């Protein structure tokens, strides 16, 4: 623990909060011009925050980690990509199951629970393995499996079986489990003990950014393909197309994320 924790950086907190809120509001309003403008304002806010934090004795976030620590930076980028690619999947599949397959909310929930069940079993095992094996390799493997699962989900149509959906969800959950725990291990293992707080905050921040970006990407895909219409049987084919496009984009993002995950360097 530091002998002199310093005063709380109120200006930095305001800049950071304003940048996050503005950027995420912009994502939610895409593809409208107002959304693009808000995203640009948010990016300017992030730039101002990083400039403000650089060189401070007691920064809210040690931004030098992003400049000097390749493992930390690439792990955070991989995390953002993974959460952007996967967080909105439950929303997409909920729409798919209830509208296109005519399942009840309870039935849809029973199908969707297959992914978190797999994650609950596999994630502790992956975390334990990452203590002994190179976490970057395990995380890259997990991201690759997730990309395969998302690619399979992008093939769904109104004739797909429930069993196929459950299998695809289990594959995606297995891959995500092998990514999340080793990736967090890589982030925490790449910093000194005195930086654990900053690294832990970064893990939470990139997770939230990825989750909100995921909803923004799906919203943009739906706006471009489906538009502002009520979901009725007349637009089910277009809805299915929008869902397939969303999963295809997610699979492509995971494929890109493999590069950052694999190229981060060795932790152990």
Where are these regions (language model features)?
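Hydrophobic transmembrane-helix bundles of small-molecule transporters
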Residues: 1-77, 111, 251
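Short, charged juxtamembrane terminal tails flanking transmembrane helices
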Residues: 4, 265-268
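Transmembrane alpha-helical segments of integral membrane proteins
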Residues: 26, 227-232
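12-transmembrane solute porter fold
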Residues: 35, 58-227, 239-266
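Intrinsically disordered, low-complexity Ser/Thr- and acidic-rich flexible linkers and loops
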Residues: 233-237
């Amino acid at each position: 623990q530091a002998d002199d924790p310093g005063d709380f950086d109120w200006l930095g907190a305001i800049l950071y909060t304003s940048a996050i809120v503005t950027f995420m509001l912009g994502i939610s309003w895409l593809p409208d011009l107002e959304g693009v403008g808000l995203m640009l304002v948010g990016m300017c806010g992030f730039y101002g925050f990083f400039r403000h934090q650089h060189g401070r004795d007691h920064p809210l976030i040690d931004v030098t980690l992003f400049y000097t620590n390749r493992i930390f930076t690439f792990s955070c980028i991989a995390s953002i990509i993974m959460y952007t690619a996967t967080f909105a999947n439950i929303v997409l599949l909920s729409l798919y199951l209830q509208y296109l397959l005519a399942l009840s909310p309870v039935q849809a929930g029973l199908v969707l629970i297959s992914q978190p069940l797999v994650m609950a079993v596999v994630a502790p095992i992956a975390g334990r393995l990452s203590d002994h094996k190179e976490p970057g390799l395990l995380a890259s493997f997990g991201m690759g499996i997730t990309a395969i699962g998302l690619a399979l989900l992008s093939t769904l149509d109104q004739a797909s079986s429930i069993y196929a959906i459950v299998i695809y969800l289990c594959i995606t959950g297995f891959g995500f489990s092998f990514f999340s725990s080793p990736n967090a291990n890589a982030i925490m293992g790449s910093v000194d003990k005195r930086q654990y707080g900053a690294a832990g905050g970064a893990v939470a921040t990139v997770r939230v950014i990825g989750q909100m970006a995921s909803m923004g990407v799906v919203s943009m895909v739906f706006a471009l393909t489906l538009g502002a219409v009520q979901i009725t049987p007349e637009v089910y084919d277009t809805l299915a197309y929008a869902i397939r496009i969303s999963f295809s984009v997610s699979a492509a993002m995971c494929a890109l994320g493999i590069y950052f995950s694999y190229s981060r360097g060795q932790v152990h």
